Structure formats: C-alpha cells, structure tokens
Amino acid sequence: MAKEDLLTLEGVIDEILPDGRFGVMLENGHRIIAYTAGKMRKFRIRSIVGDSVRVEMTPYDLTKGRIVYREKVGGGGPGGVRRRR
C-alpha cells in the first residue's frame, strides 16, 4: 500500500483504552479506535482526553487509525522546558 492511499482526518480524543489505544471522535462525527504512531511513542508524546489530534486511516478499514500528530496547547507551566542532564 502506498502512502498516498492514506486518509488524514482531524479529531478529538474522547476515551483512553487499554494497550495504548484511544477512542477518537472525528470531525465528521464518526468514532474510531486509534493507536499512537511510533515516533510519538519514541519521543514520549503523551495524549489525554480532549486533545486535538491528526489521524491517518487506510480506506480499507475506516474503523481504525494511527495518531500521527497532537495539536500543541499553550502554556508549558512554570519552569519552562526541562532538560536532561
């Protein structure tokens, strides 16, 4: 399957499921089960209920998807960015 065949949609996480999966309500009203992409896992990008996300789906199974981007929200909190020593 070529990468051009993927559908990219916007949605909001509405449920956290076991095994690193999430329930995502898409902007078109459909609800899917999505998992976190490998790069997001590698860099420990965490997602919580209410986060806006971008999901890639294959046209062959419109009930499952992969979360490839989490929209940034303002305010990192006090202290700024923490660096590893």
From Swiss-Prot:
GO cellular component: cytosol
Subcellular localization(s) per the UniProt record: Cytoplasm
Primary location recorded for the protein, binned into one broad class: cytoplasm
Pfam families from the UniProt entry: eIF-1a (PF01176)
UniProt superkingdom: Bacteria
Record keywords, A-Z: Cytoplasm, Initiation factor, Protein biosynthesis, RNA-binding, rRNA-binding
Keyword match Cytoplasm: yes
Positions of the S1-like domain: 1-72
Signal sequence range: none
Gene3D superfamilies reported for this sequence: Nucleic acid-binding proteins (2.40.50.140)
Entry GO MF terms: ribosome binding; rRNA binding; translation initiation factor activity
CDD domains assigned: S1_IF1
Protein family (similarity comment): Belongs to the IF-1 family.
PANTHER family: TRANSLATION INITIATION FACTOR IF-1, CHLOROPLASTIC
Oligomeric and partner information: Component of the 30S ribosomal translation pre-initiation complex which assembles on the 30S ribosome in the order IF-2 and IF-3, IF-1 and N-formylmethionyl-tRNA(fMet); mRNA recruitment can occur at any time during PIC assembly.
Function: One of the essential components for the initiation of protein synthesis. Stabilizes the binding of IF-2 and IF-3 on the 30S subunit to which N-formylmethionyl-tRNA(fMet) subsequently binds. Helps modulate mRNA selection, yielding the 30S pre-initiation complex (PIC). Upon addition of the 50S ribosomal subunit IF-1, IF-2 and IF-3 are released leaving the mature 70S translation initiation complex.
HAMAP family given in the database record: IF_1
Protein name according to UniProt: Translation initiation factor IF-1 2
Highest classification ranks of the organism: Bacteria, Pseudomonadati, Pseudomonadota, Alphaproteobacteria, Sphingomonadales
